[in-house]
Amino acid sequence: SCLLADAGFVAVQDNTASAGNYSSNRPKEKQRLFRSTAVEKEIARVQKLLKNRKLSWMFANCFPNTLDTTVHFRKGSDGKPDTFVYTGDIHAMWLRDSGAQVWPYVQLANNDPKLKEMLAGVILRQFKCINIDPYANAYNDGALPDGHWMSDLTDMKPELHERKWEIDSLCYPLRLAYHYWQVTGDTSVFGAEWLEAIRNIYTTFCQQQRKEGVGPYKFQRKTERALDTLNNDGLGAPVRPVGLIVSCFRPSDDATTLQFLVPSNFFAVTSLRKAAEILETVNKETALAADCRALADEVEMALKRYATYNHPEFGTIYAFEVDGFGNHLLMDDANVPSLLAMPYLGDVDVNDPIYQNTRRFVWSDSNPYFFSGKAGEGIGGPHIGYDMVWPMSIMMKAFTSRDDAEIKTCIKMLMDTDAGTGFMHESFNKNDPKNFTRAWFAWQNTLFGELILKLVNEGKVDLLNSIQ
């Protein structure tokens, strides 16, 4: 099940590490899609600090992977930067993936004007995508009338790669734009396109509270994959309108079971508050800012009331999904936003006792999608299925850890499950890392680089260098 998606990119990966020869697995310099002096300097700086040759090699392969292989930067017809970001082996732009893929480069934007311009291009492209259709999760680079999912039973358009309604698709662009603004002070991205996008986001969130009926969105697909379509004539399972927002699909692109997806509702709260701050400070749009804050407050109150469950072993925990009727789905999926990742996104405090209980629950065999085997352990999900651990979950355990020994175990496990390629994969079999999916998955590669860089910047070089 090793999916070799792009022969030019991955063909030579497998022999380098096994021979102890850690030569770069990056594309040749001429073939790299985007080059950043600041990113190259940062790679050189970190590599000098890391004594473990394999870890140093993996960092250098992974951290620039989004820039090397997925970033298509150009100027739009309006003269503004426009950046279309592939997810990797699928040549479409997910709002979630693209927002996460370029995130760790924002901290370097002030050292590299070209990088800063490219990032502004991602933000502007995301706003454009939202204004094409705020219900979509992935977009084409222009209109493709014979696109892959044009036959889906939903309001498809040729500009859309896929039209699965996922709350987090509208949160990641807000997170990225706010972070970019905080780091660079650049307000040029917050023009007319932004105001239209945030109005679309606000309206879509309100529609999917389903207080005024079921709203305009339906989705069905002819498929053998049960979680690629919605029941009840494309509306999904019923919800009671208690103030939470429906997410028909998860960040894994799988259908929700109960449609109030808890981690994504937490993400909506913080994202709306960030949007409100931009609207107030940059645009002087005080009324819309107040609307965003009021919606955030309402969702937050509903989460306090409906999102927790009193577990017999772990105490009060956050459920993964609820429906407002009193039903709770107790599990976690590796894709972010997840229950495990909530402090990473800044949506809950890592010291919140309910979160800590939840963290113990999701990393245990009480979570139906927690897998542990000879090669490693972690959380997967129904997207790939039984026994397949997603490295993303191991990274999120490290990102949210307060324990150096735990962080070290996570990094070692990530290093030991690359199947000799020097890259992260979507998932690997718990007993055999050579049995993996997606050889070219830029989000997880760049996220690994982000994690190592964070640990270096937090003074944990000695911890990383103690890994054998």
What are these regions (language model features)?
Residues 58, 113-129, 187-206, 275, ...:
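Extended, well-ordered alpha-helical scaffold segments
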Residues 14-31, 228-244, 466:
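Acidic, low-complexity proline/glycine-rich segments
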Residues 152-158, 163-166, 329-349, 387-468:
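C-terminal capping/lid segments that line or modulate ligand- or cofactor-binding pockets
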Residues 2, 6-96:
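Low-complexity, Ser/Thr/Pro/Gly-enriched N-terminal "stalk/linker" regions
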Residues 95, 131-135, 139-142, 148, ...:
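Extended ligand-binding clefts on enzyme/binding-domain cores
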Residues 91-119, 123-227, 442-456:
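Aromatic-rich carbohydrate-recognition surfaces in CAZymes
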Residues 67-81, 144-153, 238-250, 419-426:
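Active-site-adjacent bridging/hinge elements
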Residues 38-51, 100-113, 172-187, 266-285, ...:
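Well-ordered alpha-helical scaffold segments within catalytic/enzyme domains
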